[in-house]
């Protein structure tokens, strides 16, 4: 039996171990030990596991690919040893995270020479195993006679990325690219050098390894608007709903939540569950919304308004990223090759403007390779790295490319429509409820049984969607308020968000994590636009990211956030909130001291200090009805270049009324069907529009 086949056979059993502490079948266990070269003893196995995970914190030595995916999320049959092992790993991460050295370039991928070796020919090459790339590689490799190469710069998911509540700690591991924006003038003013963090995930699963896990599709109006802009009815809500449902495995774990069963998928590959349990503070937040006439709803019902416990990408309390969902179960496919620790530097385009393959650098061998695609190349690097790769390949704004000496293959507005949700992080409240604090070992034991604090994405326990003055009466959600436990503001958050020491101390430095919560205010349909540009023609430099948050000339974005602040304050003034003695924690920012506390001018100043990235960038390789207005056609094909598509968040020309992961996975499902149809393979759905 191959190593990959053994992995698949034990992978499903692992889920049971992690949730209930049950044991592996002896034959699977013995096969596993044999294939990794460990004798059949508990002590030897645990020593082997520690050797593998000692490298978790070390970017200098990429791990062996075979051992790495065996060690991923794999535990001993002895439950108490599992608790000891994972407790130690969590404590190591928490201890090392503050001093962990994150990358600031792609230097670790630089080859020793410029010689390029042949890597072979495949039917399809997918660059990037993120939210859409993992889906595309998985769906295309379902066709057994298609050879699919998936190029990924990072590693497989592991034990830490499996823990939903460790999302912030994962920012201080090799799963984070550690991008940051150029200095800003209209937002991020409380950050170091006025530069926002721009976190993107690196690994099989991409940013679904590092995000807050919220699964929200947005409004039917988003997709009908998209269909209208693209002049392609196949993107209408009615026609894309089957793709949402195809990927989803919805498990309504909160039986008291409002659920519309008909809009959900059951039995798909991507887990979706409700956030549990509800704290008394969250219950009061929901009651306050009810008191003001807002509906308790299933926000994935197509309308997208109302409040609810967060629907999140977990399965049995474990993070269910797209790598775990779409790639890990299928590593035994002989026609799917996953090339880890490999960074694509150029798309090969011939003189007839046909994409023929990809050049990539392998961090393990320190060599360059050339892989060819007989059918198509699909770029899935995300909203920052897809435009970077296209521009390095000569596809992009002519003036920008020529200024860097890059020959222009196709003049397109790549990187010129960076859009993002603008999120305000500055509302803190204390209550009379104190959250009990358990020792790490107790929390780990609960997690391994599928219960407790670690099974919940700590960044977002509940959400509420509202109309703004710009959408009132339309049912179009334009404001989101997220209910966040105060432990999301710990010292790691200061570093992760790049807050200055003064800003952090004035905002979050004196918060009692046990009795407080924060409300994040998110402007959904933003007008501010930024750019992604190359620093140089050197592919090993990070891109220049300039989001220009809150910069729209009409000030719609900041006005929308201000309106969200007013909604939040009105919620705090309800009977439901008074029952828990809610009180705003007023720590005036020195930067806004010239304004009367809580005046409109004060809030506008405060918003510019404390608004930054929600890590939802879109639009940099936007679909459009013509090449004059965008980068891709409605089938995600690059205008003017044959055999080349983009599939990730960058394809959406505007932000939606929900978090983007659901739409990104849907786009991956949809483009896979389009490709399969183009080459005569069976499709899941196809609407001619």
Give the label of every model feature segment.
Residues 2-10, 14-689:
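N-terminal redox-cofactor-binding region of secreted/periplasmic oxidoreductases
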């Amino acid at each position: 039996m191959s190593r990959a086949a053994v992995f698949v056979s034990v992978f499903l059993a692992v889920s049971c171990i992690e949730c209930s502490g049950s044991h592996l079948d002896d034959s699977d266990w013995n096969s596993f030990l044999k294939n990794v070269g460990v004798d059949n003893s508990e002590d030897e196995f645990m020593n082997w596991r520690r050797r593998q995970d000692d490298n978790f914190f070390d970017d200098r030595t990429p791990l062996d690919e075979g051992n790495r995916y065996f060690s991923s999320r794999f535990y001993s049959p002895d439950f108490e040893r599992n608790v000891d092992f994972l407790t130690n790993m969590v404590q190591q991460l928490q201890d090392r995270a503050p001093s962990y050295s994150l990358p600031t370039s792609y230097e670790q991928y630089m080859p020793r020479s410029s010689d390029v070796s042949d890597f072979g020919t495949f039917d399809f090459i997918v660059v990037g195993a993120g939210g859409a790339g993992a889906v595309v590689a998985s769906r295309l490799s379902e066709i057994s006679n298609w050879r699919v190469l998936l190029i990924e710069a990072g590693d497989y998911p592991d034990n830490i990325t499996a823990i939903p509540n460790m999302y912030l700690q994962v920012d201080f591991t090799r799963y984070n690219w550690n991008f940051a924006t150029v200095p800003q003038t209209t937002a991020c003013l409380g950050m170091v050098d006025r530069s926002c963090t721009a976190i993107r995930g690196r690994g099989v699963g991409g940013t679904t390894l590092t995000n807050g896990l919220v699964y929200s599709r947005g409004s039917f109006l988003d997709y009908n608007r998209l269909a209208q802009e693209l002049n392609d009815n196949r993107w209408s809500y009615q026609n894309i709903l089957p793709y949402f449902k195809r990927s989803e495995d919805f498990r309504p774990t909160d039986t008291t939540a409002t659920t519309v069963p008909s809009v959900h998928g059951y039995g798909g590959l991507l887990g979706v569950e409700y956030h549990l349990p509800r704290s008394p503070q969250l219950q009061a937040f929901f009651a306050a919304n009810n008191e003001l006439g807002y509906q308790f709803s299933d926000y994935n019902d197509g309308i997208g308004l109302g409040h609810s416990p967060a629907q999140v990408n977990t399965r049995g309390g474990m993070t269910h990223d797209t790598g775990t969902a779409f790639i890990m179960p299928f590593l035994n496919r002989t026609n799917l090759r996953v090339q880890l620790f490999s960074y694509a530097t150029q798309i090969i385009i011939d003189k007839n403007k046909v994409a023929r393959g990809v050049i990539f650098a392998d961090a393990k061998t320190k060599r360059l390779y050339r892989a060819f695609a007989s059918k198509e190349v699909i770029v899935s690097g995300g909203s920052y790295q897809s435009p970077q790769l296209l521009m390095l390949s000569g596809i992009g704004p002519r003036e920008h490319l020529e200024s860097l000496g890059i020959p222009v293959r196709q003049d397109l507005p790549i990187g010129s429509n960076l859009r993002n949700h603008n999120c305000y992080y500055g509302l803190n409240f204390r209550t009379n409820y104190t959250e009990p604090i358990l020792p790490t070992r107790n929390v780990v034991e609960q997690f391994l049984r599928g219960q407790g604090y670690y099974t919940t994405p700590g960044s977002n326990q509940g959400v509420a969607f509202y109309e703004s003055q710009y959408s009132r009466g339309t049912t179009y959600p334009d404001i989101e308020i997220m209910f966040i436990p105060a432990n999301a503001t710990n010292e790691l958050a200061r570093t992760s968000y790049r807050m200055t020491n003064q800003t952090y101390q004035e905002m979050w430095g004196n918060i009692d994590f046990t009795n407080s919560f924060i409300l994040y205010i998110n402007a959904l349909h933003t007008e501010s636009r930024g750019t992604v540009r190359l620093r140089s023609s050197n592919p090993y430099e990070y891109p220049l990211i300039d989001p220009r948050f809150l910069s729209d000339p009409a000030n719609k974005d900041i006005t929308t956030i201000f309106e969200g602040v007013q909604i939040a304050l009105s919620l705090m003034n309800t009977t439901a909130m008074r029952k828990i003695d809610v009180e705003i924690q007023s720590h005036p920012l020195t930067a806004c001291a010239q304004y009367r506390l809580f005046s409109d001018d004060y809030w506008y100043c405060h918003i510019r200090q404390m608004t930054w990235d929600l890590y939802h960038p879109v639009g940099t390789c936007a679909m459009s009805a013509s090449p004059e207005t965008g980068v891709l056609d409605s089938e995600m094909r690059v205008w003017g270049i044959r055999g080349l598509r983009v599939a990730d968040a960058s394809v959406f020309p505007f932000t939606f009324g929900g978090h983007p992961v659901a739409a990104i996975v849907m786009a991956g499902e949809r483009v896979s069907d389009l490709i399969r149809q183009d080459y005569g393979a069976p499709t899941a759905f196809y609407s001619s529009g």
